């Protein structure tokens, strides 16, 4: 343990010295050793983490940074979202050099262009692009199964090892345990006030995205037993409870900012929050088909063009978590989410949910511009 801590402190010192000397803030700050497994980068929630883990890799979610872009505009059109541009920043400046490879998904045009830039300018041993269908149908299931099979073959070719069904099944069990544990944490938000904040939830999910699930599961079990004790509802808590929906949010400070404006965020309809863990895999003899079915039929994001299903899910979660309203946030240039706003708002208002739409550039510097609107929304919900 002492040896590990020494290595940890030395790593932090080296990183700080590097930042001071070069002025480069996009270093490998996240690569604190949590596993001996090589890391495989991924970006989209439709990426089958179980296949990556079964192949012997640690799935590592790529999330860029929360500052204005520095170099991305030299490689890609400026009218792309902060997620893509910040990821290019970190990649170009070497922040992801420790990754063994990256698995992309054709989730939107910006992500496809990110794949193109990465493939050309970022030296990476393994790059794979998953073509996920937009339709939730029997044909779509056949297609996504074929795509998962292509990924499996590509990983086997790269590692020179066959991915056995036993390994896939073990990975499924491991990640399903992670999802179950997350739901146990999420249930703490049913209390009034919530026993855990939205900021803490995003921090916990972010840890999951970059940790070995074996270690993450053990840590969460310990925290559930010791840290999160059952407490009665508080009397007189008047903070309105809301759902946060929209584009991906990786920085917990964004959630913290909303909560500081007088709201309790109790569910995230986000691919980086609660919704990410709302996935159930029914194992069968054909494990690739089981994975394909689970991922294809998960609660859809805007990219899947299932706006009625998304609205229905938000309404169901609103009833479950007893919320009064929804903040739907979208990144600038995030076309798939911006396109949905008018119809989604209409569907939610029909169900007596108040909706606030906010658009940001994805940087923490833009938060103060939204403060007045969020505080006003909080007052409306109180009354």
Model-assigned labels for residue ranges:
Residues 44-63, 245-317:
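Redox- and metal-dependent alpha/beta enzyme cores, enriched for Fe-S-associated oxidoreductases
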Residues 68-77, 136-141, 274-281, 366-368:
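Short, charged, surface-exposed secondary-structure boundary motifs
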Residues 76-93, 303-316:
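Glycine-rich, highly charged phosphate/nucleotide-binding loops
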Residues 20-28, 33, 41-45, 49-50, ...:
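Metallocofactor- and cofactor-centric catalytic cores in central/energy metabolism, strongly enriched
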Residues 307-351, 356:
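C-terminal hydrophobic structural anchor segments
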Residues 2-38, 145, 149, 153-279:
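A charged, amphipathic alpha-helical module
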Residues 2-4, 11, 342-383:
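Peripheral docking tails and interdomain loops at the edges
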